[in-house]
């Protein structure tokens, strides 16, 4: 599991997950089984969506798993938990001890958070995007105008609205506008090709899409039109009959598409009172977003997360990280990923920090932005921070404003933590772990933890979270024993969107999320991720799933069989290697297949090397023996 990206950097390739805790992964979900009997709890079971549809989630069973406060205390067998924020972050570490960490109870919905921030931080700088600078009051006005346009376009509460664009002010405004109108946000990975985006749009039954014009030399509009040009629909993309409108976040758009300016103008007839009434009617347990994460089946699945889950999780994240009013936050983690969106946009709204979105990871640009904008907060995968430390021009830039780094999604060397603290004098360096299915955050180190704990572990459970290390039968294991990491708490997704079978595989009847990761809990409750049960590997912080890559490569007419594994890479941590069997008579070369793959899939999925073989090793049941391929690679 995991998001496609916990936070990936564009240069590193996208993906998601496992490190989302800032680290989706920095790059970067189950169940709505919220705290039993608490206000804003009971987050599970999905919620009825627009137009009389069935619940969004597909959770197995509806019964609560009990009040987490009665669960076994930390130290019992291989379980750890944390319910009280004061236990998680002692008062000595709290920078604002009077603030209520229950963001779900404070704001109710993301729409409520946006309006509160627009009032509370009205004159503070909210977003810096190139030469554009806007205050929180101006951001609130823009979001309300976008919400009005969504309502004018026919968006109803529960409808899915997608955004396919890089980190920009327009992403922030369009996404928050859709959510304020009561829609369920569906972020699309900017590394997707047209067919990949079309699949998610079709699977989520998206009604409205916001899309960038051209990004990194690719016309997203042209890519979509090629992939969805033929079909039964009468809308802008015939192969997607439920997609009623496509809005291009630019000044021009092809026929049957709308420009951003035209779309916004359409909402001018909607009274502000109507927008605020719509926003104020959003229940806290209503779905706020669906994060699609690829799985070992090769087909993306949508983790449904509620407003209450997002607000509670990232109020806690902000508290534990020490994010504060006046911080200036360079958001390199993609907005399409849980971490970029929620530990970025949502957290900044909560604390009044300034968002400085960066659409593409480029070390020179990052260094320049840190110096010019006096950046104080810089989450990202380890590759980002290693690139900064190793840059030959580093000392020519003023980096003294940096005070907070959150990382994860990959192995974090002790030397990296020590260098960030020692050479850049960064006061707070933290690591964390999460996955899309658990709202992107499960564990997190605490300010004040020694460098050895920060580098070797992903920290302790965040408030309201239970962790269990299990054997293959689901029995809890003692401290120090490796097993699968199971998670239970208020942040577990409401289920995979309209997929009860996959939801039942992911979540036990009593609410435990099977993460598919192998980990160890130490006596202090710190979690160390040691392996992955699945074959997933992480490319620069983006989760890459062999089954999905194999399915795509298998579409090549000259490929008879293929298996993909992750291999070590000095820059990205891991990259893919494909073992492929050519069809008889084929003269396909490795370079040919790699070039073809770059045209057909997101670049982080593209194998960096290809080895042709006469056959793949298989066991008696026909399953490919990937351990043999890994052993072959090591020799």
Question: Where does each model-flagged region fall?
Answer:
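AMP-binding/adenylate-forming catalytic core of the ANL superfamily
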Residues: 1-9, 192-198, 209-211, 378, ...
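Gly/Ser/Thr-rich phosphate-binding loop
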Residues: 262-265, 375-380, 389-453, 466, ...
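Conserved AMP-binding/adenylate-forming core of the ANL superfamily
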Residues: 102-106, 110-115, 120-168, 172, ...
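Conserved AMP-binding A3 loop
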Residues: 135-138, 280-312
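Conserved pre-ATP/AMP-binding loop-to-beta segment of ANL
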Residues: 105-107, 122-123, 239-240, 247-248, ...
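AMP-binding/adenylate-forming core of the ANL superfamily
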Residues: 468, 479-493, 512, 518-519
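Conserved AMP-binding/adenylation subdomain of ANL enzymes
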Residues: 311-328, 336-377, 391
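Structural core segment of the AMP-binding/adenylate-forming
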Residues: 3-7, 17-18, 51, 152-153, ...
């Amino acid at each position: 599991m995991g998001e496609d990206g916990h936070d990936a950097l564009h240069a590193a390739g996208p993906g998601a997950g496992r490190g989302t805790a800032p680290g989706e992964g920095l790059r970067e979900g189950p169940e709505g089984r919220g705290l039993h009997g608490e206000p804003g709890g009971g987050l599970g079971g999905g919620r009825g969506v627009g137009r009389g549809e069935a619940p969004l989630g597909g959770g197995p069973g509806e019964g609560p798993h009990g009040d987490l406060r009665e669960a076994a205390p930390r130290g019992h067998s291989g379980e750890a938990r944390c319910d009280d924020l004061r236990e998680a972050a002692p008062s000595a570490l709290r920078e604002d001890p009077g603030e209520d960490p229950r963001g779900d109870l404070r704001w109710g919905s993301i729409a409520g958070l946006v309006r509160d921030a627009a009032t509370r931080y009205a004159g503070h700088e909210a977003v810096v995007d190139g030469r554009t600078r806007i205050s929180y009051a101006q951001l609130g006005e823009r979001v309300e105008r976008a919400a009005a346009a969504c309502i004018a376009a026919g968006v109803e509460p529960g409808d899915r609205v997608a955004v396919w664009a890089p980190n920009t002010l327009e992403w922030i405004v369009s996404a928050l506008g859709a959510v304020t109108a009561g829609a369920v946000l569906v972020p699309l990975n900017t590394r997707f090709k047209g067919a990949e985006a079309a699949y998610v749009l079709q699977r989520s039954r998206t009604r409205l899409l916001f899309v960038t014009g051209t990004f990194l030399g690719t016309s997203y509009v042209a890519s979509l039109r090629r992939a969805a040009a033929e079909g039964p629909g009468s809308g802008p993309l015939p192969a997607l009959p439920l997609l009623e409108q496509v809005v291009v976040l630019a000044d021009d758009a092809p026929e049957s598409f709308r420009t951003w300016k035209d779309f916004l103008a359409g909402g001018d007839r909607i009274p502000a009172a109507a927008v605020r009434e719509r926003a104020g009617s959003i229940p806290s347990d209503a779905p706020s977003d669906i994060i699609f994460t690829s799985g070992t089946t090769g087909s993306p699945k949508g983790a449904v997360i509620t407003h209450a889950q997002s607000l509670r999780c990232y109020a806690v994240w902000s508290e534990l990280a020490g994010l504060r009013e006046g911080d200036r936050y360079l958001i390199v983690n993609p907005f399409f990923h849980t971490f970029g969106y929620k530990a970025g946009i949502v957290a900044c709204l909560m604390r009044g920090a300034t968002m400085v979105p960066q659409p593409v990871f480029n070390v020179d640009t990052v260094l320049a932005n840190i110096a010019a904008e006096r950046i104080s907060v810089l989450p990202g995968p380890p590759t980002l921070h290693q690139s900064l430390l190793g840059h030959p021009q580093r000392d020519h830039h003023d980096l003294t404003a940096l005070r907070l780094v959150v990382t994860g999604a990959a192995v974090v060397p002790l030397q990296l933590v020590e260098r960030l603290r020692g050479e850049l004098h960064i006061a707070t360096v933290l690591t964390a772990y999460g996955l899309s299915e658990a709202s992107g955050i499960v564990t997190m180190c605490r300010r004040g933890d020694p460098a050895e704990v920060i580098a070797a572990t992903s920290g302790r459970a965040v408030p309201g979270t239970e962790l269990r290390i299990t054997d293959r039968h689901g029995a809890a294991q003692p401290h120090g024993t490796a097993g699968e990491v199971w998670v239970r708490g208020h942040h577990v997704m409401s289920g995979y969107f309209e997929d009860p079978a996959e939801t039942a595989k992911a979540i036990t009847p009593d609410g435990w999320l099977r993460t598919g990761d192998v980990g160890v809990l130490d006596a202090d409750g710190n979690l160390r991720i040691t392996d992955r049960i699945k074959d997933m590997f992480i490319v620069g912080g983006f989760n890459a799933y062999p089954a999905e890559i194999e399915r795509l490569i298998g579409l090549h007419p000259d490929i008879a069989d293929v298996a993909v594994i992750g291999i070590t890479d000095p820059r990205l941590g891991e990259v893919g290697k494909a073992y492929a069997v050519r069809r008889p008579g084929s003269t396909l070369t490795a370079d040919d297949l790699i070039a073809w793959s770059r045209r057909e899939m997101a670049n982080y999925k593209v194998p960096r090397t290809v080895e042709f073989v006469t056959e793949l090793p298989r066991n008696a049941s026909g399953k490919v023996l990937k351990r043999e391929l890994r052993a072959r690679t090591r020799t």
